[in-house]
C-alpha cells in the first residue's frame, strides 16, 4: 500500500513541477516572439529552451506549424527560415522509469535529421515521428528529385538511436 502511495505522490510532484515549468516557458516565449529573428544555422546553440516550447499545445492535439516565408539576409539574398519545429534540440531529462520513444530531430549543422529517444514524460511535441517527415519539412537546400534522393539516402540509414 505504501508503494502505491509513494507512486501517486511522485506522479503528483512531477505534474506540479511540469506545469510550473510550462507556465514559465510560455511566459518567456510569449515575450520573445514579438521581435524574433531567425537563428543562424551556424549558431545552433543560440536556440533556448523557451524557444523550443513556443510551439507547445495542450490536450494532446497535434498542430502543424505554419510554413514561414523567406526573410532577406544581409547580402540581399533570400534565405528560407526554418519552422520552429525544425529548431528543436533534444535535451537531457530526468524522467525516471519513463518509457522512451524513437523520434527524429533536424540538425542544421549536418543538414539532416538524426534519431534520438524521447521520454514520454516530456510534454513537448516538436520532435518528428519519422525521418521522412522531418527531412521534408526542414531541408531547404535541395528541391525536386535531388531532395527525394537525399531523403531516401539519409532515412535509409539505420543509425544507433542516442538517448535524449
UniProtKB/Swiss-Prot annotation:
Pfam families: Kunitz_BPTI (PF00014)
Keyword check for Signal: yes
Keywords: Blood coagulation cascade inhibiting toxin, Disulfide bond, Hemostasis impairing toxin, Protease inhibitor, Secreted, Serine protease inhibitor, Signal, Toxin
Disulfide bond residue pairs: 86-138, 95-121, 113-134, 131-155
Signal peptide: 1-18
A GO cellular component entry from the record: extracellular region
Coiled coil stretches, renumbered: none
Start and end residues of each BPTI/Kunitz inhibitor domain: 86-138
Region described as Disordered: spans on this chain: 20-84
Stimuli inducing this protein: By blood feeding.
SUPFAM superfamilies: BPTI-like
Subcellular localization, as worded in the UniProt entry: Secreted
Low complexity bias locations: 27-36
Changes seen on gene knockout: The tick attachment time is prolonged and the engorgement body weight is decreased after gene silencing by RNA interference. No significant difference is observed in the feeding period and survival.
Protein task: Anticoagulant protein that may inhibit serine proteases. The anticoagulant effect of this recombinant protein on blood clotting is found both in the recalcification time (RT) and the activated partial thromboplastin time (APTT) tests, indicating it acts in the common pathway of blood coagulation.
Name of the protein described by the UniProt record: Anticoagulant protein rhipilin-1
Amino acid at each position: 500500500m505504501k508503494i502505491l502511495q509513494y507512486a501517486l505522490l511522485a506522479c503528483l510532484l512531477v505534474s506540479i513541477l511540469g506545469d510550473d515549468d510550462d507556465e514559465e516557458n510560455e511566459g518567456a516565449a510569449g515575450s520573445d516572439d514579438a521581435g524574433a529573428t531567425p537563428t543562424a544555422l551556424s549558431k545552433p546553440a543560440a536556440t533556448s529552451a523557451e524557444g523550443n516550447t513556443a510551439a507547445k499545445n495542450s490536450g494532446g492535439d497535434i498542430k502543424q506549424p505554419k510554413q514561414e516565408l523567406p526573410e532577406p539576409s544581409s547580402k540581399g539574398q533570400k534565405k528560407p527560415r526554418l519552422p520552429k519545429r525544425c529548431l528543436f534540440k533534444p535535451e537531457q531529462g530526468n524522467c525516471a522509469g519513463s518509457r522512451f520513444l524513437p523520434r527524429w530531430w533536424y540538425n542544421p549543422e549536418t543538414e539532416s535529421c538524426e534519431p534520438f529517444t524521447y521520454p514520454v514524460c516530456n510534454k513537448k511535441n516538436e520532435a518528428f515521428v519519422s525521418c521522412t517527415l522531418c527531412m521534408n519539412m526542414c531541408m531547404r537546400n535541395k528541391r525536386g528529385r535531388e531532395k527525394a534522393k537525399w531523403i531516401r539516402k539519409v532515412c535509409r540509414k539505420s543509425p544507433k538511436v542516442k538517448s535524449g
